[in-house]
Amino acid sequence: MKISSKQPRKQRKFLYNAPLHVRQKLMSAPLSRELREKYKVRNLPVRVGDKVRIMRGDYKGHEGKVVEVDLKRYRIYVEGATLRKTNGTEVFYPIHPSNVMIIELNLEDEKRKKIIERRAG
């Protein structure tokens, strides 16, 4: 998964052509200080069900559960971070995972627990 080139065009090309299993890893967000101390891991890929705090942008400070992870567009959708369209419907505002902090993990998946244990060392 290592990107060896420093050229911006090749960086962009890598992101554009990245396969889904690589995109999943690129959708990482930092953990809160409490979670970092508890699990000894600095960041993890965001998953549906994680509770996050938005750190940057118009919705800064807002907290909510992740409703959807869009690997194609490298965006996540958070409960409560919505826009009202002109026809009145509510749509989720797309947020890049680097702009959020995970404050509560969804640990229903046993594989995810094993990943955290393995990465903690």
Curated annotation (Swiss-Prot):
According to its UniProt entry, what is the function of this protein?
One of two assembly initiator proteins, it binds directly to the 5'-end of the 23S rRNA, where it nucleates assembly of the 50S subunit. Located at the polypeptide exit tunnel on the outside of the subunit.
Name the record gives this protein: Large ribosomal subunit protein uL24
> What's the encoding gene here?
rpl24
- What's a Gene Ontology MF term here? structural constituent of ribosome
| Membership in a protein family | Belongs to the universal ribosomal protein uL24 family.
Superkingdom of origin organism: Archaea
Q: Name one GO cellular component term.
A: large ribosomal subunit
InterPro entries recorded for this chain? KOW (IPR005824), Rib_uL2_dom2 (IPR014722), Ribosomal_uL24_CS (IPR005825), Ribosomal_uL24_euk/arc (IPR005756), Ribosomal_uL24_KOW (IPR041988), Translation_prot_SH3-like_sf (IPR008991)
GO biological process entries: translation
Assembly, per entry: Part of the 50S ribosomal subunit.
What keyword terms does UniProt attach to this protein?
A: Ribonucleoprotein, Ribosomal protein, RNA-binding, rRNA-binding
